[in-house]
Amino acid sequence: MATSKKGLISPGIFIPIFEKNGFITELDMFVFTQVCKNFKRWENENFPTFPISINLSRVHLENPDFISELERITKEYEIEPNLIEIELTESAIFDNTKILFKIMQTLKSVGFKISMDDFGSGYSSLNMLKDMPIDVLKLDRQFFITVGNAKKSQIVVSSIVQMAKQLDIKVVSEGVETVEQAEFLRLIGCDMAQGFLFARPMPIEEYEKLILDRYSVKGKEIN
């Protein structure tokens, strides 16, 4: 979120406020719609597209009918659901396991990918991973604050990555800020990494320029 005076505002600041006043559901649907609009525009412009992750608030768990609205929006803009990854936070998952598992299965049946965000930030249960219908596990940045020099942290992260692979779950490491962290994650077979080392949050115009620049460097032409 951005304002003209303060610039980018962290989701950690405005999301709790919106969850309290009930505006979060409207915000989530607005974001989802904008993503679908952009996918359609990129498709029309022959612009490279990649799956996009969208965070959904735990508030939606109180109204499972929201899935039909997500499906309606994707059909309106003729977007394949598998281009969208629905992110649910660790805290939401472990607070409402029975309800959420059913919702996750329904989302997957529609075609959406499911990811568990901020894994490791709370009281995660490794045993529960075998039952969760998720496609992607996003490791919380707390794992990597000391990963460059803490042997125990490296062992924990490596074990989680290997276990996820055995469960056919992709792993994304959040909060990567150093080359050493990225190299460690590459060596243990982590699927993807994100963090300030690669890019900071940016407006869509900057994102599009970044993609165009990188593709032009590779010698690919985009109409």
Which stretches of residues belong to each language-model region?
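Conserved functional hotspot residues or short segments at active or partner-binding sites
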Residues: 103
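Conserved, function-defining core regions and hallmark residues within catalytic/recognition domains
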Residues: 14
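Residue-level signal for well-ordered alpha-helical positions
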Residues: 20-21, 150
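Catalytic core of bacterial c-di-GMP phosphodiesterases, primarily the EAL and HD-GYP domains
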Residues: 1-4, 17, 23-99, 175
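EAL-family c-di-GMP phosphodiesterase catalytic domain
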Residues: 1-6, 57-64, 83-98, 110-223
